[in-house]
Amino acid sequence: MDILIVTPRADFWNGLNGVFEKRGASVRTACAMPEALASLKEKKAALAVLDLFGGEAWNGAEHADAMKKAVISILMQDAMTNTASVCGMGEETFHDAMEGLGMINDLPAQPSEADVEDLMSRLRVILGQA
């Protein structure tokens, strides 16, 4: 299973690669959406993790608009790519802001190994691998 992480902080995510690999996933990164879309065109991903704001605190409408555009761009490239955000906006805000986009969940701005484990468990359920 291939995971694409869109992030300006690849070093941070490199520290979590072991969690993905333990679940049988390979990880690649893209520093911005144009690179991510080009990467998806070359090779599909089971999941795109959108860490667009580099660990910044949730900024409301501005971040919501950017996240929606990113998710829609990915779905237009490949509608089978699952997505998750990294904003730490909280469950209620996440559901209100991202309603209808079919995203798995929102991770905290500084995800832990446990957060990644939870995300991978959810993805496996969606993919019928649980």
Describe each PLM feature range.
Residues 41-43, 73-81, 101:
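Conserved phosphotransfer cores of two-component systems
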Residues 49-77, 91-93:
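Conserved phosphotransfer microenvironments
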Residues 31-47, 55-56:
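Acidic, metal-coordinating helix/loop segments flanking the phosphotransfer/catalytic sites
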Residues 18-20, 39, 97:
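Alpha-helical interaction/dimerization surfaces of two-component signaling modules
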Residues 93, 111-127:
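C-terminal output helix
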Residues 62, 82-108:
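Alpha4 helix (beta4-alpha4-beta5 surface) of REC/receiver domains from two-component response regulators
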Residues 10-29:
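Two-component/phosphorelay signaling modules centered on CheY-like receiver
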